[in-house]
Structures are given as structure tokens and as C-alpha cells.
Amino acid sequence: MEHFRNIGIIGRLGSTQVLDTVRRLKKFLLERHLHVILEDTIAEILPGHGLQTSSRKMLGEVCDMVIVVGGDGSLLGAARALARHNVPVLGINRGSLGFLTDIRPDELEVEVAKVLDGHYLVENRFLLQAEVRRHGEAIGQGDALNDVVLHPGKSTRMIEFELYIDGQFVCSQKADGLIVATPTGSTAYALSAGGPIMHPKLDAIVIVPMYPHMLSSRPIVVDGNSELKIVVSKDMQIYPQVSCDGQNHFTCAPGDTITVSKKAQKLRLIHPLDHNYYEVCRTKLGWGSRLGGGGD
């Protein structure tokens, strides 16, 4: 296991609870004589911190590990910037759900100490890369750890499009949109739209139509190395949008093509040794607990 000396900290802005947790984390790391580097945006609202700062884009180059304090959305944003550097990422949950941010604030010192002592698991999560092309030229590009979503934007009208997988025509469709999700994203927007839960170790992509105009239209799970192409109908009278993790947005025009494929770099996500994916699902999704008197 790697032993970490240079620790980066990213914190969600706009929350006093996050700031309090960042201060505790900073104090704990410094007491262990580690080199702490703050992302510049959180550093601006921590006057007198006396630490090295870095942009999020460069943080992965100067750190052995980055700790994200916030919710799953905070970690999604960090993942897109850090995956290219192959730097491990650990999440401390200050959000509402916490599928990706494992550690509770009240156990910060104990659990982070275990990680620093080499007691942790590393899970590789792949990202998607999306590109919007118009008349053969790229007009927008983005990465996503959860999902790439084609949606109507501010319009209430349906989108008409064609779907191709690895160059093979699959179908044309009228729907409110289309969700292309990783296993990580299968418990997010795709789940709300009726998609399946996929274990994070699966090398697969799920394609989930949003309110399709055909009862036979169902989610499709394809190989993780597939290349998807979505062609917006030339007869459309609206300009739909493509969103990556709900954070980066591109506007499409009729006739545009969206390609989605696996990104080469992966996110290295750190978990405590006792991390249990099914326990996370059971807790976060409200599944039934063990029956009384059941076996171990």
C-alpha cells in the first residue's frame, strides 16, 4: 500500500459545516507532520491558513492523495479533474447521500488515520468522455464519472434521435432524453429513470431512455468499451442539451452528433477496509435489514 505524505484538500463552498470539517482535517494532518495543500477556492475563505495552495487542475500533480470534504457532487467535480493524474481520492461526507464519500465527519480522525497507516482499499472507477460534433467539427467536450445525459433543457418537448452502438444502428426514439451511465452512476439519475443497479466492478455502460414514447423501450446494458453515437434529428425545432454529471452543459442543434465512450484514465477511489457496497446500497436506498432470527 502507498503511504501518503502530500495531502490535498478540496471542500465544498457555501457550507459552514464543510469549513469546520476542513479545519479539523487540516489540524489533524499537520499534527501527523504531513504536507497539506489546499485547493485555492477553499483556501480563500480560510484566512491565515499558512499552507501551500493549488488550483484543482494542478492539485493532482503535487499530491499523493486528495481528500474531498462535501457530498457526492463535490467528489464528482473533483474526480473529473484528478483522474488524469492517477491520484487516489478519499471522501468525507458532508452531503445528503454519500454513495462516494464514505467517511462520516464524527469518525474523521480515526478513519483517516487508518488510511494514512496503509489500511485501505482502492477501487478503480471509470469515467465517460462525451463529444458534441456539428458538421464534423467538435463544439463541446466533457467527462463524467456518473452520467452523460441528453435532455430538452428548458423546453418541455420531446427529443427525437437515433442511437448507434459500435457503428451499428440500434433504434430511433422519441423521448424526454437519454441517460448514458457508468456503474458508479447507475445509483444516481439512471436509477430514478428505471435503470438497473450495476456493481462498480462491472465493465459496462447502461443506456436508459427518459420517458420514451414507446412502451417497449427499455434500458440496455452494453460492454464498457462500446462507443455510443447519438444523432439528434435534423427535423427538431428545439435545441437540446448534453450534461456531464449535471455540472458541465453543452447545447446541441438539430443534426448534431454526440459520441460517448470510456475515458482512458480512471478515478482511484479510496475506501476504508470494512467498506461494503451492499451495505451502502442498503443504507442509502432504504433496503430491508436482516430478518429477525436470520443467520449470519
UniProtKB/Swiss-Prot annotation:
<keyword id="KW-0067">ATP-binding</keyword>
<comment type="similarity">
    <text>Belongs to the NAD kinase family.</text>
</comment>
<keyword id="KW-0963">Cytoplasm</keyword>
<feature type="binding site">
    <location>
        <position position="174"/>
    </location>
    <ligand>
        <name>NAD(+)</name>
    </ligand>
</feature>
<dbReference type="GO" id="GO:0019674">
    <property type="term" value="P:NAD metabolic process"/>
</dbReference>
<dbReference type="GO" id="GO:0005524">
    <property type="term" value="F:ATP binding"/>
</dbReference>
<feature type="binding site">
    <location>
        <begin position="72"/>
        <end position="73"/>
    </location>
    <ligand>
        <name>NAD(+)</name>
    </ligand>
</feature>
<feature type="binding site">
    <location>
        <begin position="146"/>
        <end position="147"/>
    </location>
    <ligand>
        <name>NAD(+)</name>
    </ligand>
</feature>
<dbReference type="InterPro" id="IPR017438">
    <property type="entry name" value="ATP-NAD_kinase_N"/>
</dbReference>
<keyword id="KW-0418">Kinase</keyword>
<feature type="binding site">
    <location>
        <position position="247"/>
    </location>
    <ligand>
        <name>NAD(+)</name>
    </ligand>
</feature>
<dbReference type="InterPro" id="IPR017437">
    <property type="entry name" value="ATP-NAD_kinase_PpnK-typ_C"/>
</dbReference>
<feature type="binding site">
    <location>
        <begin position="187"/>
        <end position="192"/>
    </location>
    <ligand>
        <name>NAD(+)</name>
    </ligand>
</feature>
<dbReference type="Pfam" id="PF01513">
    <property type="entry name" value="NAD_kinase"/>
</dbReference>
<feature type="active site" description="Proton acceptor">
    <location>
        <position position="72"/>
    </location>
</feature>
<dbReference type="GO" id="GO:0051287">
    <property type="term" value="F:NAD binding"/>
</dbReference>
<dbReference type="Pfam" id="PF20143">
    <property type="entry name" value="NAD_kinase_C"/>
</dbReference>
<keyword id="KW-0808">Transferase</keyword>
<dbReference type="GO" id="GO:0003951">
    <property type="term" value="F:NAD+ kinase activity"/>
</dbReference>
<dbReference type="GO" id="GO:0005737">
    <property type="term" value="C:cytoplasm"/>
</dbReference>
<keyword id="KW-0547">Nucleotide-binding</keyword>
<keyword id="KW-0520">NAD</keyword>
<dbReference type="GO" id="GO:0046872">
    <property type="term" value="F:metal ion binding"/>
</dbReference>
<feature type="binding site">
    <location>
        <position position="176"/>
    </location>
    <ligand>
        <name>NAD(+)</name>
    </ligand>
</feature>
<protein>
    <recommendedName>
        <fullName>NAD kinase</fullName>
        <ecNumber>2.7.1.23</ecNumber>
    </recommendedName>
</protein>
<dbReference type="InterPro" id="IPR016064">
    <property type="entry name" value="NAD/diacylglycerol_kinase_sf"/>
</dbReference>
<keyword id="KW-0521">NADP</keyword>
<dbReference type="InterPro" id="IPR002504">
    <property type="entry name" value="NADK"/>
</dbReference>
<comment type="function">
    <text>Involved in the regulation of the intracellular balance of NAD and NADP, and is a key enzyme in the biosynthesis of NADP. Catalyzes specifically the phosphorylation on 2'-hydroxyl of the adenosine moiety of NAD to yield NADP.</text>
</comment>
<dbReference type="GO" id="GO:0006741">
    <property type="term" value="P:NADP biosynthetic process"/>
</dbReference>
<feature type="binding site">
    <location>
        <position position="157"/>
    </location>
    <ligand>
        <name>NAD(+)</name>
    </ligand>
</feature>
